Swiss-Prot record:
This is Microtubule-associated protein 1 light chain 3 alpha. It is found in: Endomembrane system; Cytoplasmic vesicle, Autophagosome membrane; Cytoplasmic vesicle, Autophagosome; Cytoplasm, Cytoskeleton. Keywords: Autophagy, Cytoplasm, Cytoplasmic vesicle, Cytoskeleton, Lipoprotein, Membrane, Microtubule, Phosphoprotein, Ubl conjugation pathway. GO terms for molecular function: microtubule binding; phosphatidylethanolamine binding; phospholipid binding; ubiquitin protein ligase binding. Pfam families: ATG8. GO terms for biological process: autophagosome assembly; autophagosome maturation; cellular response to nitrogen starvation; mitophagy. The record marks G120, F121 as: Cleavage. 3 different light chains, LC1 (a cleavage product of MAP1B), LC2 (a cleavage product of MAP1A) and LC3 (produced by one of the MAP1LC3 genes), can associate with the MAP1A or MAP1B heavy chains. Interacts with TP53INP1 and TP53INP2. Directly interacts with SQSTM1; this interaction leads to MAP1LC3A recruitment to inclusion bodies containing polyubiquitinated protein aggregates and to inclusion body degradation by autophagy. Interacts with ATG13. Interacts with ULK1. Interacts with TBC1D5. Found in a complex with UBQLN1 and UBQLN2. Interacts with UBQLN4 (via STI1 1 and 2 domains). Residues 121 form a propeptide. Ubiquitin-like modifier involved in formation of autophagosomal vacuoles (autophagosomes). While LC3s are involved in elongation of the phagophore membrane, the GABARAP/GATE-16 subfamily is essential for a later stage in autophagosome maturation. Through its interaction with the reticulophagy receptor TEX264, participates in the remodeling of subdomains of the endoplasmic reticulum into autophagosomes upon nutrient stress, which then fuse with lysosomes for endoplasmic reticulum turnover. Its main location: membrane.
Amino acid sequence: MPSDRPFKQRRSFADRCKEVQQIREQHPSKIPVIIERYKGEKQLPVLDKTKFLVPDHVNMSELVKIIRRRLQLNPTQAFFLLVNQHSMVSVSTPIADIYEQEKDEDGFLYMVYASQETFGF
């Protein structure tokens, strides 16, 4: 079971940067993505892991399908995947494009998922 603390709080900035560098060297066609449950989410389960290596040709709709399957959601359950806790991106957008635009300074691409698209901002 993953920790309740966000990934950024569990690992130092230097460790995260080093890990991304190793991942990109060993898997140049994979995007390092951290996917965590939105902190206020109550309905959706917690993923069994938070770190994913996503092939760079995958688009957002494929990633959503993968995450829905991992969460074992039924087709009627609402599910929203947000980049950097704020951006809903087009499902046809390749993950490589999103990575270039939205990656964190540590090199990971951060996403959160929730059952509602309104987050009280």
